[in-house]
Amino acid sequence: MAVISELKRHHPKTGLLRYLPTGVVPYGELVRIHRALGYYLNTSPYVVGIAYTAATAETKLPLDLLLDRLLLLTLWSLILRSAGCAWNDLVDVDIDRQISRTQSRPLPRGAISLSAATIFTACLFVLGCSLLLFLPRECLFDAGIKVFFALLYPFGKRFTDHPQLILINIAWAIPMAMHSLGMEPSSQILSMLCMCVFFSAVIVMIDLVYSRQDTEEDLKVGVKSMAVRYRNCVETMAYSLFAISSLALLFGGVLGGLRVPFVLFSVGGHIVGFWRFLRASLQAGPAGVESRAKSSCLIASVFWVLGLGIEYAEMVKEKDNPTDKKKHPH
């Protein structure tokens, strides 16, 4: 009883939560507003998808269109991530009560009722889907895939040792970004698939390393995950996924007709950022893995977009100067 009483008094003062009114804080916790890593991982594929489509398109895409789609897809990803977190906590509330790291979440500690959380979650999904009204019709199918897997994810740890594989749906942001710009993914099927494999490997790699912090308690409770299933070879799997992501990014650029700036900045920045993350996280252990992943994601994302941005700028320059003998290779 003392533990429950203490949890109910729990009022975190970290990150953005410190700026929220006391009554709103539990809802901020429910959507992980103080956990920036998840928002990076969900939003960066859309940002890269927009930049990649712009850099590899046969025709010059207007900057105002790119910014419009970037804003809409960023909002969509932020809201979907929030709704997914709330849904995950609703489904996992009984498990969360048994894991020390999650006992202080708002539902296990009783800061929000299940009925209030359910209504809040439904409103988030409706709000996110309302943004689809401003996007091409093809994006409805893409969004349906994303929502389906967001709803499925919390059940994965009950039935499979590989629930992280459900997270690869995040990579579907690439074809959704292409559709949002009026481009057909099938016209660049190989390069598009490489970019999807790239993000899939990144997502699973980070979640695999991040999940190690709960391995001992997951074993006791019976929660399944790749970190539990492969607990004796996590390092090998993590580096393998890192290699796959690096190669997939490289091939995605080459097949899309991208050149030196992409290889130097996007691929090079990815390798440096996540090599740093893996070395630090796998040597130091689970403690502090979130902050290391967050900084590495930020560094890598900046370089992913920088390389693609330079490619787009060069393509625009060539399109605007048709007399230039240098032709874009697409």
Swiss-Prot record:
InterPro entries to which the protein is assigned, alphabetical: Prenyltransferase (IPR039653), UbiA_prenyltransferase (IPR000537), UbiA_sf (IPR044878)
Classification via Pfam families: UbiA (PF01040)
GO molecular-function term, one example from the UniProt record: 4-hydroxybenzoate polyprenyltransferase activity
Record GO biological process: austinol biosynthetic process; dehydroaustinol biosynthetic process; terpenoid biosynthetic process; ubiquinone biosynthetic process
Domain of life: Eukaryota
Location(s) in or outside the cell: Membrane
Recorded catalytic activity of this chain's protein: 3,5-dimethylorsellinate + (2E,6E)-farnesyl diphosphate = (3R)-3-farnesyl-6-hydroxy-2,3,5-trimethyl-4-oxocyclohexa-1,5-diene-1-carboxylate + diphosphate + H(+)
Keywords assigned: Magnesium, Membrane, Transferase, Transmembrane, Transmembrane helix
Pathway the protein acts in: Secondary metabolite biosynthesis; terpenoid biosynthesis
Cofactor needs: Mg(2+)
Membrane topology: Multi-pass membrane protein
Disruption phenotype: Impairs the synthesis of austinol and dehydroaustinol and accumulates the intermediate compound 3,5-dimethylorsellinic acid.
GO cellular component, one term: mitochondrial inner membrane
Family in the record: Belongs to the UbiA prenyltransferase family.
Main function: Polyprenyl transferase; part of the gene cluster B that mediates the biosynthesis of austinol and dehydroaustinol, two fungal meroterpenoids. The first step of the pathway is the synthesis of 3,5-dimethylorsellinic acid by the polyketide synthase ausA. 3,5-dimethylorsellinic acid is then prenylated by the polyprenyl transferase ausN. Further epoxidation by the FAD-dependent monooxygenase ausM and cyclization by the probable terpene cyclase ausL lead to the formation of protoaustinoid A.
Name of the protein described by the UniProt record: Polyprenyl transferase ausN
Species annotation: Emericella nidulans (strain FGSC A4 / ATCC 38163 / CBS 112.46 / NRRL 194 / M139)
Gene this chain is encoded by: ausN
